[in-house]
């Protein structure tokens, strides 16, 4: 199986199946797909809290609400994530919950671009 075939197979999975795949890979290889919570010692974190906030380079794009234009927001979600119609609709309907993450670990520029596209479609978005 080539890498292209693997990517093609992964593209066909639902969000729930992708989450299960990630869990299986984490268990199989003994790793975690989540970003580390604390990268510096406690004393450094207390002293440089404001500086740490400015230096953040990865953001999670979270959908807070889809507003009055649900269909437009679904279209933008599909464009950004490559999800199928059902998966994109399910994600949009989770707006306001912790599960409504459109993109995890996005670079600052990418996260701001995604936020701009979603807000133009009528959604309320938060960068975490």
UniProtKB/Swiss-Prot annotation:
GO terms for molecular function: mRNA binding; structural constituent of ribosome. It holds the Pfam family Ribosomal_L12_N. GO terms for biological process: translation. The keyword Ribonucleoprotein applies. Keywords: Ribonucleoprotein, Ribosomal protein. Signal peptide: none annotated. One of its GO terms (cellular component) is cytosolic large ribosomal subunit. Forms part of the ribosomal stalk which helps the ribosome interact with GTP-bound translation factors. Is thus essential for accurate translation. PANTHER family: 39S RIBOSOMAL PROTEIN L12, LARGE RIBOSOMAL SUBUNIT PROTEIN BL12M. Belongs to the bacterial ribosomal protein bL12 family. HAMAP family: Ribosomal_bL12 (MF_00368). Homodimer. Part of the ribosomal stalk of the 50S ribosomal subunit. Forms a multimeric L10(L12)X complex, where L10 forms an elongated spine to which 2 to 4 L12 dimers bind in a sequential fashion. Binds GTP-bound translation factors. This is Large ribosomal subunit protein bL12. The gene is rplL.
């Amino acid at each position: 199986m080539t890498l292209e075939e693997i990517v093609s197979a992964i593209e066909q999975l639902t969000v729930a199946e992708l989450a299960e795949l990630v869990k299986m890979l984490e268990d199989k290889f003994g790793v975690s797909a989540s970003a580390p919570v604390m990268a510096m010692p406690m004393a450094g974190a207390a002293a440089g809290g404001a500086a740490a906030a400015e230096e953040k380079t990865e953001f999670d794009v979270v959908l807070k609400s889809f507003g009055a234009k649900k269909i437009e927001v679904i279209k933008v979600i599909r464009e950004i994530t490559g999800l199928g119609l059902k998966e994109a609709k399910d994600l949009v309907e989770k707006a306001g919950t912790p599960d409504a993450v459109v993109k995890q670990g996005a670079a600052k520029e990418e996260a701001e671009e995604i936020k701009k596209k979603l807000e133009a479609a009528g959604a309320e978005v938060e960068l975490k």
